[in-house]
């Protein structure tokens, strides 16, 4: 007998939907709302944190979304090596802060924030980075604990395309349609 814990998106969708649906709405507001951070950077942060946490399912989807939004061929570099990443210089301190939020939140110092603010970002961006990291950590925990396997390349590209076209609301609609079958 397969327990709900192991490898099934249905476990998340069916048994936890009453509260998971609210989280999807939160993700829609957090990740898709127009702010000083472009959506591709938000998705890159989510992918980066997911990679650090060993959640290949989330890393792959969010990296694909970021890549498609950025229209660059190589999404791995920013996720593995911040200093040599092929992104604008102003976004590197953002990824460094995200790393500290994920790895050792108490290690954050004023200089980390100042490095971001010097590029013209406001303090709302700091809160946004922290919130994206928290959202990624939560989803990584849910996905890894349920032992959900990464999608294959075709499914991953399709999921990224759906997320770009329909947002997290599209994900919610998809999950509801599957639940109602």
Task: For each feature predicted by the language model, list its residue ranges.
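Single conserved hydrophobic/aromatic residue that forms the stacking wall/gate
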Residues: 1-7, 11-12
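Secretory/periplasmic and organellar redox-cofactor proteins
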Residues: 8-9, 110-126, 135, 139-181
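Iron-sulfur (Fe-S) cluster-binding segments and ferredoxin-like electron-carrier domains
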Residues: 20-21, 59-76, 149-151
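Immediate flanking context of iron-sulfur cluster ligation sites
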Residues: 34-52, 124-127
């Amino acid at each position: 007998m397969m327990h709900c814990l192991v490898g099934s998106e249905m476990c998340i969708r069916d048994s936890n939907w009453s509260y998971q649906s609210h989280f999807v709405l939160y993700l829609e507001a957090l990740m898709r709302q127009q702010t000083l951070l472009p959506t591709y950077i938000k998705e890159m942060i989510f992918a980066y944190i997911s990679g650090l946490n060993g959640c290949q399912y989330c890393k792959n989807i969010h990296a694909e979304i970021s890549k498609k939004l950025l229209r660059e061929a190589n999404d791995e570099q920013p996720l593995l090596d911040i200093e040599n990443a092929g992104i604008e210089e102003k976004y590197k301190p953002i990824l460094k802060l995200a790393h500290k939020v994920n790895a050792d939140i108490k290690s954050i110092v004023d200089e980390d924030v100042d490095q971001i603010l010097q590029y013209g970002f406001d303090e709302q961006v700091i809160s946004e980075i922290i919130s994206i990291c928290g959202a990624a950590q939560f989803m990584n925990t849910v996905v890894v604990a349920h032992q959900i396997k990464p999608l294959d390349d075709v499914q991953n590209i399709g999921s990224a395309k759906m997320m770009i076209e329909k947002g997290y609301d599209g994900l919610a609609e998809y999950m509801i349609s599957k639940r109602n079958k």
